[in-house]
Amino acid sequence: MTMGDMKTPDFDDLLAAFDIPDMVDPKAAIESGHDDHESHMKQNAHGEDDSHAPSSSDVGVSVIVKNVRNIDSSEGGEKDGHNPTGNGLHNGFLTASSLDSYSKDGAKSLKGDVPASEVTLKDSTFSQFSPISSAEEFDDDEKIEVDDPPDKEDMRSSFRSNVLTGSAPQQDYDKLKALGGENSSKTGLSTSGNVEKNKAVKRETEASSINLSVYEPFKVRKAEDKLKESSDKVLENRVLDGKLSSEKNDTSLPSVAPSKTKSSSKLSSCIAAIAALSAKKAASDSCKEPVANSRESSPLPKEVNDSPRAADKSPESQNLIDGTKKPSLKQPDSPRSISSENSSKGSPSSPAGSTPAIPKVRIKTIKTSSGEIKRTVTRVLPEVDLDSGKKPSEQTASVMASVTSLLSSPASAAVLSSPPRAPLQSAVVTNAVSPAELTPKQVTIKPVATAFLPVSAVKTAGSQVINLKLANNTTVKATVISAASVQSASSAIIKAANAIQQQTVVVPASSLANAKLVPKTVHLANLNLLPQGAQATSELRQVLTKPQQQIKQAIINAAASQPPKKVSRVQVVSSLQSSVVEAFNKVLSSVNPVPVYIPNLSPPANAGITLPTRGYKCLECGDSFALEKSLTQHYDRRSVRIEVTCNHCTKNLVFYNKCSLLSHARGHKEKGVVMQCSHLILKPVPADQMIVSPSSNTSTSTSTLQSPVGAGTHTVTKIQSGITGTVISAPSSTPITPAMPLDEDPSKLCRHSLKCLECNEVFQDETSLATHFQQAADTSGQKTCTICQMLLPNQCSYASHQRIHQHKSPYTCPECGAICRSVHFQTHVTKNCLHYTRRVGFRCVHCNVVYSDVAALKSHIQGSHCEVFYKCPICPMAFKSAPSTHSHAYTQHPGIKIGEPKIIYKCSMCDTVFTLQTLLYRHFDQHIENQKVSVFKCPDCSLLYAQKQLMMDHIKSMHGTLKSIEGPPNLGINLPLSIKPATQNSANQNKEDTKSMNGKEKLEKKSPSPVKKSMETKKVASPGWTCWECDCLFMQRDVYISHVRKEHGKQMKKHPCRQCDKSFSSSHSLCRHNRIKHKGIRKVYACSHCPDSRRTFTKRLMLEKHVQLMHGIKDPDLKEMTDATNEEETEIKEDTKVPSPKRKLEEPVLEFRPPRGAITQPLKKLKINVFKVHKCAVCGFTTENLLQFHEHIPQHKSDGSSYQCRECGLCYTSHVSLSRHLFIVHKLKEPQPVSKQNGAGEDNQQENKPSHEDESPDGAVSDRKCKVCAKTFETEAALNTHMRTHGMAFIKSKRMSSAEK
């Protein structure tokens, strides 16, 4: 399995884990099984006080270093055949469990080299799990072996038969008791009470330690005699091979007082084991001195199985020893392990180049009649180490001091423990013998942590070669391998190995010079903790990337950084249900200890604060806040540092709380994809960094609120910077619910008939009726309004929407199907059902992601779904990458210099290829045309939603009450309902869309005929906004403004011009700009007294001052001067005689810009032509002939005394009721003369005739004279403003003036 085959962790379930606690306790959040280890540690501490018996470890004559504070319990564990390990992580380095078993080819016993008088004692000490074994067990097959979990005891017990230790379980039991008694009394005498205590402690330790290797201690007692027989045979063979003399020690070992530190997490050192083992040579049968003078140097020497009982060893074991001895002679030295400072001196591969002198220990074993084993351990003077210049006791003390210095490093207790049933354990077994030696030995490094394999920490630079001289004068060269010196793996494993341990480890520089100290971190890359060095093979990656597999073996050839010939063979037996995965799962599944925060949303009445009904809610944890800023601070809070590499964003992100991380994941989920990451690290935030200033918090927080859901400045900023991005959408599994009106209708202004008036279908309730109107048909069933380009979901909604433009009854809401009266209809549609929030969106054919802009969709399809090929410039071959094309050209077209390959774009929907990206984008139009969908834009924050109900929920939760209203695209909100057919607008609009002209060129080039120039401007109307930089067309104003700001760096005001790149802050300024710049309608005043210069003035006052000052005329005749200007006269005539085209030109300018209270003058002129089609409110009769209408409505009069409305035919019993009706419905303040029978129909007909001329032909003066009060104004705008004060007199005067003409 390669890295390419790995699956990155899927965060699909991340959104559901909203109850993640923010604070990650470095000891509780990650620690799995910590309580179990605590009890284990306590028992270990008690064991230290009583005995220094060596803890249990691997079988055979091997040097095994294991970090064990557990003294008595470890001894007890050996009696029972178990292998207790230390707790967790020690000094920042991962350790592995004991070697469960050696392979049949690799395991062997060299116990035959020890005299028979010592066999009995040494057999019991070097049991299956002895932590200290003879260095003669240096095997040719260096391994890293990992203890299986306790539930694998059957496998382990089966391996036991292959372990050639020559030690029987009963012997181990007896000898452990003897050795334990000797250590506790410091005299070498054993006590049965200590043995019993060891047994009791061991039983408790078995229940608490997760790394205990369960073995049946007495299953192989019968093989005891055979194993001892084999030991004798081995001894004879080894003696024949020759005796090795220990190398002299060139340097003196300093004598350091042993430390008494009781740190629960100490890193085991090979020095202690080697020193203790070497001291055996000096032991005599009568001498009973203890080896260790410090409880910290717990790895004590154990017997070398040379007992006469070894002669009983089975032939199978002897054959296995012989078989494994031969290849071991060919193996070079392996990488080294941890050693003391001075032990590296004299080593061939160590920097000092010296070999230390190792003290000897003599162990005597006596089996009593009761079956118990008594052992005595004494130091003896070295035979060949006298020239080292130091006494053996000093050498031993210095070795022990070195070990103590390692064990007493100030790392605190381990905070990372492995899962109870699946610890990740490892051990290192290396071949430490130089090729020249006849008896290669094996050193087993047994760290006791349970997180990640520390193979990546081994370096040969820190290795040491130590000579061990046994009691039979056999000299063994042992290589000590540092657990922190392998360079074949990446630093990610080192971090994972130190999972959340933040404390650094202080160890001697020479032994741990290359150790990488890592803070508390948890890596999740599935966990992507792969060694990335070139020296590690894929088998290690396969082992380290299967978290659910408990036992996995792989053979890795890890090349050492020493001479090329020295390559060690490492075997990994690891359990990869890592504690890191367990830790993060615990974080995800744990319950948030803090209750959901609900603010007080009822401020005092005198405070004048308006709060949303539900506050501002965090969608990740459920907390609500009264202020929007509080929600922003909630997302910016610092609780835990989360570093993640998002595969979709292709960037490294840093979050400081789980809400911001889940919000980012939610953002991807709403886009139709599931968040995936390749690396995730959890780190606690230091207390001094949790509270930061807002400025620094904003700068340091890379991504605190990436999701477009929710309120806050982060959300608004994101939307404004990427308004053309995707639309917020609900998950596909969410049931579609109709969006009901925002507010209830307590006054019953609207009614629901439960019957669709378009298709006559009857529904059960209002919700079903709303679903009928909002349910989108297939793509072909959707309708687009020809007037406002709104996309309607179905035919019924489209028909009711069309009547809005036509102002025809019945006034049916296109959203909910409610029927309203005309006076309440616009309010219901705009404020309650938010009909005008509909926008046109575009759905991706491939992934169904919705975009609000067609350009964004095209870019998405081209970047995500279309293939790009690189064509060879010479031949027709094309390739998927440029390097492939270059390689092809190099091989197929040698000698020909080619340039860059030509890029070919392939359409993902029809497989058509294009050579230009612009051609591809243009081609997309034919596919996207049928992919339009409705999206909904929030009026306040401009967020876009694919479902209307989502927008409604957003408004209720985030805004409460809307501050702005999305009005109709081409009608003012407060305008009366005009009954203008949609066909006229659409026809004129289609004609106007045919041609476009540049307004700037028209201004620069003066037309000889202003009328002609004005006629040309009629063709300029555009349905949207065109970007002047890139010629992109935008149908929505805010999208156009965002595009210009984002793509071209220009700031646009709220009202951009459709015909140029100018923008204005108010609609009035935009109208004036259009009238002057693009329509050429300019009020100018020319001086008649300056015939040469023909000076003109934009204001009448300026002309008057000019005439008075320059020409000395006190009372100038303005009428004469205005008549003298041809340009002004023609402009006025054009303005008066052709008002309708002018209005039609100005209406599309405001088509997509809701006025929201700012009613511009062109729209006000619509009041003149309000009643063009007359409709009888009683029977529905319609006609455009006012005379015919007045002839029709008298038939509905009930009697001669009733008052009938001349506008709609309704009858009233009093004049007051009729006046109220005229004012409310028809916007008429002054009721017309009421006609009892026929009335003055002709006069009303004249009054209501559409006017074709707005101004009198008298010129500028009459144009600016109020026809009600005869007051004259300088500008037409001032006159229009004044006319509003007269109410209906304004409309009457207009109608009268038109009637007179």
Swiss-Prot record:
Keyword Magnesium: no
Low complexity composition bias: residue spans: 337-359
Xref: InterPro entries: Zn532-like, Znf-C2H2_11, Znf_C2H2_sf, Znf_C2H2_type
Keywords: Acetylation, DNA-binding, Isopeptide bond, Metal-binding, Nucleus, Phosphoprotein, Repeat, Transcription, Transcription regulation, Ubl conjugation, Zinc, Zinc-finger
Pfam families per the UniProt record, alphabetical: zf-C2H2_11, zf-C2H2_6, zf-C2H2_ZNF592
Residue numbers carrying Phosphothreonine: 205
Start and end residues, zinc fingers (C2H2-type): 616-635, 754-779, 783-805, 842-865, 870-893, 905-927, 936-959, 1025-1048, 1055-1078, 1085-1111, 1203-1226, 1264-1286
Cross-link (Glycyl lysine isopeptide (Lys-Gly) (interchain with G-Cter in SUMO2)): 459, 516, 980, 1144, 1167
Residue ranges crossing the lipid bilayer per the database entry: none
Residues with N6-acetyllysine modification: 175
Region entry Disordered, spans: 26-206, 223-266, 281-366, 983-1017, 1230-1263
Listed name of the protein: Zinc finger protein 532
A molecular-function term among this protein's GO annotations: zinc ion binding
Main location: nucleus
Consequence when changing residue 822 to L: In a breast cancer sample; somatic mutation
GO CC entries: nucleus
Job description of the protein: May be involved in transcriptional regulation.
Segments of skewed composition (Acidic residues): 136-151
